[in-house]
Amino acid sequence: VHIRESLKNKEVDDVELDSFLRRVFYLAFDSTNSAGYHKLKDRIHQLRQEQQLPDKIIYYLATPPVMYELIPTCLKENGMNVAGSEDGWRRVIVEKPFGTSLESAERLNKHLIHIFDEKEIYRIDHFLGKETAQNVLAFRFANGIFEPLWNRNYIDYVEITAVENLGIEQRGGFYETAGALRDMVQNHLIQLVALT
C-alpha cells in the first residue's frame, strides 16, 4: 500500500505497477537477533520454490551504518552469504557512509571481504542515481555541441547549489554521527563537481 501511495502522482503504468507489486514481499524481523535470519532464510526458500526463482540474491543494506558489520555476520552464521547452487550467487550492497574514517572504512572492508568475495560487494551512494545528477551526465555527454567545449578553456566557474526541502526528519541519529557536512559536501556535492 505504501509503495502504491508514494507513486500516486508519478507517471506509472498501473499494469506494470501491479506486476511489480506482486513481486514485492515484506518481512519484519529484528536484524540484531539471529532468529530473524532463520525467518528470512525460510521466507526466501519458500518464495524461490513457489515462484521458481533463481538462486540469485542481493542483500541491500539500507540500514544505519552501525549495522554494516552485524548483518553480514548474521548472514554468514546462517549460511546466507553463499549460493546453494552452482549457477547461483549472493551480492551485498552497502550505502555510504562506508565508515567514519580511513581506519573504520578499512576495518569494515576487511570484515566484508571475510564474508563475501570482493566481486560480490557493492559500495554505493544513492545520490548519483538521482535525476539531477543523471541529467548532468546526459546534458554533458549526449550533446555533441557541448562536450568539446565543456572544459577549463571555455568555462569560468561552476556553481553548485544544494537546496533541500527536507529537514532532519527521522535522520537525527544519522546526522549526530555522520554530520551534514560529511554527508552533503564531502560526498554529494563533490560528486557533482566530479561530474562537471
Where does each model-flagged region fall?
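Secretory/organelle targeting and membrane-embedding segments
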Residues: 1-196
